[in-house]
């Protein structure tokens, strides 16, 4: 917990006359502490938007995943049902969610075809660069994970990517359209056609990899799960397209991070050893549980949960401040909640802001290793690995080997923006 940041938040509150019920934001006012996407941000649509060809990327449901996972065992449906029961999972429950998702995907496809739009339906394995080039727009039919997958192969900043939550009861869908359009997708298409929406240009992180023994070939973590291989073995398997080199200059990796990049040892119980340089500053040796670099989009995902503080911790800090004689106001639940919420909301920023928020997870601080900044905004971050079995994971789905001698450079470039839409509820 960053206690100095909490104290700064507390000072800001004291300096205001803030002990009144918060007023409701006006219609045209940005909500305090929230990214602009939550308050109707983005840029107005220049006329309507009506694609001719759309690719729909459908998520793999848990039911489909379990089927694929044991496909080599040639299990019958009854065998699968019994196996899931042994693991404490409900076969009927998984099948029900699968049917709900499938029905909503069919609704999306039928709605598109009713408008005369050519449609391709693909799953993860069929989704490739050729499919993206064919389409005028990409629709992610699933949840946030499917949206991240769909965005990962779209490098053209002018090609829209739209998320539709196909199971709102079980999926949050922060990156998707409001849930009402799950069952009313024709209405969404009409609003697109009339220009009744706003573009949101989400910034993404581009990655360069250089150094000794690097391998720029990615590993699909979803496919790895299906292969039942442990992550520590992922980079030891023999691959035809292995492009490992003894030493090389910077190579631009074929993915962009919409949410975040995580760097750390594959075995979470092992400390990650690396050197870090922020905005071309001096290199600093660190040991920690890894580091997270996020965009404004990802600031309310993993990064938020790494950095957020609990009300209990805030109350403890305020009690210490009161004992030191620095707190004159009465300590009550309202004060604790106000400080907690303001601090946590300060961790969020607009998806359109061209900056990276990096966070060090559980830094080790002693006479050898330091952590001068546990969390900081930056425009460029470079990391040199001193790890043994580490990985660099993009949006939780694509992994790159990142061991001793490898150097990763991460930055924001306007060319990498992702074009998404905002529709009102």
From Swiss-Prot:
It is found in: Mitochondrion. One of its GO terms (molecular function) is protein homodimerization activity. It comes from the Eukaryota. Its EC number is 2.7.1.23. Pfam families: NAD_kinase. The keyword NADP applies. Disulfide bonds: none annotated. The keyword Aminoacyl-tRNA synthetase does not apply. Residues 20-46 are annotated as: Disordered. Transmembrane segments: none annotated. GO terms for cellular component: mitochondrion. Keywords: Acetylation, ATP-binding, Kinase, Mitochondrion, NAD, NADP, Nucleotide-binding, Phosphoprotein, Transferase, Transit peptide. Inhibited by NADH, NADPH and NADP(+). GO terms for biological process: NAD metabolic process; NADP biosynthetic process. Residues 1-45 form a transit peptide. The modification N6-succinyllysine is found at residues 59, 285, 300. The modification Phosphoserine is found at residues 171, 350. The modification N6-acetyllysine is found at residues 59, 300, 380. Homodimer. Mitochondrial NAD(+) kinase that phosphorylates NAD(+) to yield NADP(+). Can use both ATP or inorganic polyphosphate as the phosphoryl donor. This is NAD kinase 2, mitochondrial. It comes from Rattus norvegicus (Rat). The lineage of its organism: Eukaryota, Metazoa, Chordata, Craniata, Vertebrata.
